Amino acid sequence: MLQLREPQMVHKHLKLAVLGIVVIFTTYFIISSLSSPTSTHKTEYNSPKLQLAKELELNSNWKELGLNFQPNKKYSLPDESTLRQQLSYQFPYDESKPFPKNIWQTWKVGIDEKSFPKRYLKYQQTWEDKNPDYKHYVVPDKQCDLLIEQLYSQVPDVAKAYRIMPKSILKADFFRYLILFARGGVYTDIDTVGLKPVDEWISNSEMILEKKNRSGLVVGIEADPDRPDWADWYARRIQFCQWTIQSKRGHPMLRELIAKITDITLTRHKKGQLKKVLGKNEGGDIMNWTGPGIFTDTVFEYMNNILQSPEVFKNKKKWATIIDWKLFTGMEQPIAIDDVLVLPITSFSPDVNQMGAKDSHDPMAYAKHMFSGSWKDDGMPEMEQ
């Protein structure tokens, strides 16, 4: 009898042990599934895209009060070519440094020449008077050429692209990006008037909407045409102006813009198309070669690159448009996306009496463009149709 009961007891204890193990593992997996989301859900939840959506939901009145969005994680494109590597090496970006106290302007001749227009003397003086602590440069065209040759001697493709541009308006556009990338500060057209000291611009404040100001690039709205025929008048639905730009030395957006313009120029040169109009007209061609079209596109691309998930770059997944013109249309206060600060139309385009722009006395009015159109008479041969 004892020999029969002993195996039964062992079998009973074994069943209890197995049952206990099953219960323990089942409980563990249930608790794990409830307390720890999968890596996919975690990545999606923490993605900059969803962070931005949550921020906009919490700040539904961002267009009236402004926005300062700083993603917890940001991803940047790796250097795609030796040109970008050369630019990054020669002019490294340090966002911790303040904006350089430089003001850059250009004109055909030097400011001491008799042929320098008197009205431009008056305009440029407003920048000097309001910014006595700044170095103010009014660079004549010939000096622009020499300066770019010197600054970009170690990036020969860029120097060549600038040198072979067939029209002075193309060079004038390219120069502003090149000088800001190499030296930083404020670039402003010679036909602009300074309304407030640069040190009083919101871009130079320590905080923006109770968050640390990390601005490295400052752009303003040029056009916000809320009308069905906007494409007949402007290159983009929201267009950033490039008659006044503030930037720190080596900003990555300018690096991408310079690389694009260099590639376009050298490709056109190789194909014998430097003087050909490749767009629907000469104005449109310039807009998308060096002007507000390509400038606006590159600013948007930079902001969107910051907000992409890492899988986009690692696995070459589809690039998503997270930020477009809808975020900025109708804005009345600054919007910061990481280190890009976008100013409302009033900041650089007051008194235009349209698209929501206010007058020159508004607190957000920093500079006024007088629209002299001096670049139109550039003394260069006409481009071929």
Curated annotation (Swiss-Prot):
A motif (DXD motif) lies at residues 189-191. GO terms for cellular component: endoplasmic reticulum membrane; Golgi apparatus; mannan polymerase complex. It is found in: Endoplasmic reticulum membrane; Golgi apparatus membrane. It is a single-pass type II membrane protein. Keywords: Endoplasmic reticulum, Glycosyltransferase, Golgi apparatus, Membrane, Signal-anchor, Transferase, Transmembrane, Transmembrane helix, Virulence. The conserved DXD motif is involved in enzyme activity. Belongs to the glycosyltransferase 32 family. This is Initiation-specific alpha-1,6-mannosyltransferase. It comes from Candida albicans (strain SC5314 / ATCC MYA-2876) (Yeast).
